[in-house]
Amino acid sequence: MENVVSLQNVVRTYIMGDNEVRALRGVSFDIEQGEFVSIMGPSGSGKSTCMNMIGCLDRPTSGIVKINGRETALMTEKELAVLRNKTVGFVFQQYHLISAMNILENVMLPLKYQKVDRAVRIEKAKAALEAVGLGERIHHKPHELSGGQKQRVAIARAMVTEPKILLADEPTGALDTETGKQVMEMFRKINNEQNTTIIIVTHDPRIGESTERCIKILDGQIVTE
């Protein structure tokens, strides 16, 4: 199987005033196409910095980050933006839905940025919402939905571009336990049916245990995987 994510001895250092903060201290791991993985650690462990590396939102101070075979440190900002748009779908704890738009329009938005024809955008967005069980609610606005339904819209929006990697940051953090389980089942279904690589960043051991593989990070270093 091909590696869609590869981190090799990655160090990320930030300068904060007079202090140097090492968020990542020589992190190495590979993730293959089709894996269902969690990156787990407490606040300040470096897991969010790992997410930023995988999502092409940041570059390493040293070491190598490869996404879909391409080394991010060697890419221009424009090339990184294209890689993000076409290869990675993002799901966050906060849903980031646009309140003035109905959910169909929200899900269509990433395709608009890709300059996809409107008729195709509508067709793909409807299919994505159908896949997450919201095909009957396409004209509803976000405020008319429950928290779990909003997160399903966010998942549909992330999947509408058919990314190789779905990157989710604490996706169940704002949900009750039962709704959180349903969202995790949705991720598992996408992973099984579409062979999408799913990477969930979490502090919650229950989420870590529910994925096929759990990469644990503490103080900027991998402690187990």
Cite the ranges covered by each PLM segment.
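Conserved switch/coupling elements of ABC/ABC-like ATPase nucleotide-binding domains
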Residues: 219-225
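ABC family nucleotide-binding domain
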Residues: 2-217
